């Protein structure tokens, strides 16, 4: 009953946004706000050359993976993941597009993807009923564990339950479907999000264990969307000496390149690697591995790049 009443109250809320907006200049779009793995780049404790330049020059840092759906006409945006860099990511959107936070979709309960919601609490923003969209285990985790449950109790956030594979109409121009994937689900399940706007469609999937561990083919989602932002955490298994890579499984870039080598060029061009670990050579603009990925017809997500709307 709690799920139902919460969902009904949110459905009443979204009808406030059911007007029609005409004109390309008013078209909503998706923007990349971060491309790094949970710890960002540079990452805490890193003294290696991969982080050295970023420590010396903050302009070279990469925020944690996050995308936003921006509606410039209605002056609203929705975040996909709440990262440690959420204050900077929110400030960027506010200054550049004069838009306000309308909701957050959380993929899972790993530190880089949900802990940013702490900034909505009374110690910081003190927001009122910001919609936060989650799958069932994530819902349970947030309402039963502090400090997150305080955000719910004080009504800083309003948890909106989602069901995997069931599209949720956020407004008449914007639909989101949670797609559950296999990952290290210690505290919650893990989701990717399928976004459908009135002009373009997108798939945001920053974390998955391995493509072959999923009972679905990722290629089907690439085919049915215009842009896919996919897990590119590690380039190869040798990237972090001394770490057991089986404890932190992700599809290596080299595995993805091999899997997709025979895809049509138009399909390859939809793929944008995101969620890059600070050690990933794809973060280095002149690295030959980065050039090889681009030469293969695939892309590497870039902070500040917008997709759809008026380019």
In which residue ranges do the predicted regions lie?
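Active-site metal-binding motif and surrounding structural segment of the metallo-beta-lactamase
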Residues: 71-133, 224-226
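Core dinuclear metal-dependent hydrolase active-site scaffold
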Residues: 24-93, 159-221, 305-311
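A short helix-to-beta-strand connector/capping loop
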Residues: 26, 128, 152-158, 171-174, ...
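Short internal beta-strands
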Residues: 105, 130-139, 229, 272-274
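Positively charged n-region of N-terminal signal peptides that target proteins for export
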Residues: 1-5
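Bacterial N-terminal signal peptides
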Residues: 6-19
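A short, active-site helix/loop in glycosyltransferases that binds the activated sugar's phosphate group
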Residues: 137-147
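Cap/insert and terminal regions of metallo-dependent hydrolase folds
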Residues: 196-201, 208-306
């Amino acid at each position: 009953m709690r799920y139902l009443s919460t969902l009904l109250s949110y459905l009443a809320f979204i009808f406030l946004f059911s007007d029609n907006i005409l004109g390309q200049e008013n078209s909503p779009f998706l923007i990349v706000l971060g491309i790094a793995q949970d710890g960002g780049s540079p990452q805490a404790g890193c003294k290696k050359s991969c982080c050295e330049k970023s420590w010396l020059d903050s302009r070279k840092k990469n925020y944690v993976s996050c995308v936003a759906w921006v509606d410039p006409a209605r002056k609203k945006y929705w975040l996909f993941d709440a990262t440690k860099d959420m204050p900077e990511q929110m400030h960027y959107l506010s200054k550049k597009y004069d838009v306000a936070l309308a909701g957050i979709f959380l993929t899972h309960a790993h530190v880089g993807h949900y802990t940013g919601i702490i900034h909505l609490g009374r110690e910081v923003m003190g927001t009122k009923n910001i919609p936060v969209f989650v799958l069932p285990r994530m819902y349970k985790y947030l309402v039963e564990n502090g400090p997150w449950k305080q955000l719910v109790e004080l009504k800083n956030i309003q948890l909106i339950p989602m069901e995997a594979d069931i599209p949720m109409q956020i407004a008449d121009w914007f639909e989101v479907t949670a797609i559950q994937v296999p990952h290290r689900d210690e505290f919650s399940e893990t989701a990717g999000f399928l976004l459908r706007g009135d002009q373009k469609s997108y798939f945001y999937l920053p974390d998955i264990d391995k493509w072959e561990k999923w009972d679905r083919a990722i290629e089907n989602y690439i085919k049915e969307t215009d842009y896919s932002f996919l897990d590119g955490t590690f380039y190869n298994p040798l990237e972090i000496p001394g770490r057991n890579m089986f404890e932190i499984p992700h599809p290596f870039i080299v595995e993805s390149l091999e899997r997709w080598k025979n895809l049509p060029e138009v399909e390859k061009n939809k793929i944008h690697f995101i969620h890059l670990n600070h050690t990933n050579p794809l973060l280095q603009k002149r690295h030959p591995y980065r050039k090889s990925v681009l030469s293969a017809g695939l892309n590497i997500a870039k902070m500040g790049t917008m997709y759809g709307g008026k380019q």
